Amino acid sequence: MAYKILDTCVSCGACAAECPVDAISQGDTQFVIDADTCIDCGNCANVCPVGAPVQE
């Protein structure tokens, strides 16, 4: 199961910087995770100041 980013995302970019497989990119209004690339490491959730990345 991959992670997804909730609407509480503040677009700070902390998650994208920590993703070892570059699965996170800036979307139209917030960052998004490519579920096919995500390896479920949890780095994004660990660094997010608002807890936006959650496991699907």
UniProtKB/Swiss-Prot annotation:
<keyword id="KW-0479">Metal-binding</keyword>
<dbReference type="InterPro" id="IPR050157">
    <property type="entry name" value="PSI_iron-sulfur_center"/>
</dbReference>
<dbReference type="GO" id="GO:0046872">
    <property type="term" value="F:metal ion binding"/>
</dbReference>
<keyword id="KW-0411">Iron-sulfur</keyword>
<feature type="binding site">
    <location>
        <position position="9"/>
    </location>
    <ligand>
        <name>[4Fe-4S] cluster 1</name>
    </ligand>
</feature>
<dbReference type="GO" id="GO:0009055">
    <property type="term" value="F:electron transfer activity"/>
</dbReference>
<feature type="binding site">
    <location>
        <position position="12"/>
    </location>
    <ligand>
        <name>[4Fe-4S] cluster 1</name>
    </ligand>
</feature>
<dbReference type="GO" id="GO:0005737">
    <property type="term" value="C:cytoplasm"/>
</dbReference>
<keyword id="KW-0408">Iron</keyword>
<dbReference type="InterPro" id="IPR017900">
    <property type="entry name" value="4Fe4S_Fe_S_CS"/>
</dbReference>
<keyword id="KW-0004">4Fe-4S</keyword>
<feature type="domain" description="4Fe-4S ferredoxin-type 1">
    <location>
        <begin position="2"/>
        <end position="28"/>
    </location>
</feature>
<dbReference type="InterPro" id="IPR017896">
    <property type="entry name" value="4Fe4S_Fe-S-bd"/>
</dbReference>
<feature type="binding site">
    <location>
        <position position="48"/>
    </location>
    <ligand>
        <name>[4Fe-4S] cluster 1</name>
    </ligand>
</feature>
<feature type="binding site">
    <location>
        <position position="41"/>
    </location>
    <ligand>
        <name>[4Fe-4S] cluster 2</name>
    </ligand>
</feature>
<feature type="binding site">
    <location>
        <position position="44"/>
    </location>
    <ligand>
        <name>[4Fe-4S] cluster 2</name>
    </ligand>
</feature>
<keyword id="KW-0677">Repeat</keyword>
<protein>
    <recommendedName>
        <fullName>Ferredoxin</fullName>
    </recommendedName>
</protein>
<dbReference type="InterPro" id="IPR000813">
    <property type="entry name" value="7Fe_ferredoxin"/>
</dbReference>
<keyword id="KW-0249">Electron transport</keyword>
<feature type="domain" description="4Fe-4S ferredoxin-type 2">
    <location>
        <begin position="29"/>
        <end position="56"/>
    </location>
</feature>
<feature type="binding site">
    <location>
        <position position="19"/>
    </location>
    <ligand>
        <name>[4Fe-4S] cluster 2</name>
    </ligand>
</feature>
<dbReference type="GO" id="GO:0051539">
    <property type="term" value="F:4 iron, 4 sulfur cluster binding"/>
</dbReference>
<feature type="binding site">
    <location>
        <position position="15"/>
    </location>
    <ligand>
        <name>[4Fe-4S] cluster 1</name>
    </ligand>
</feature>
<keyword id="KW-0813">Transport</keyword>
<comment type="function">
    <text>Ferredoxins are iron-sulfur proteins that transfer electrons in a wide variety of metabolic reactions.</text>
</comment>
<dbReference type="Pfam" id="PF12838">
    <property type="entry name" value="Fer4_7"/>
</dbReference>
<feature type="binding site">
    <location>
        <position position="38"/>
    </location>
    <ligand>
        <name>[4Fe-4S] cluster 2</name>
    </ligand>
</feature>
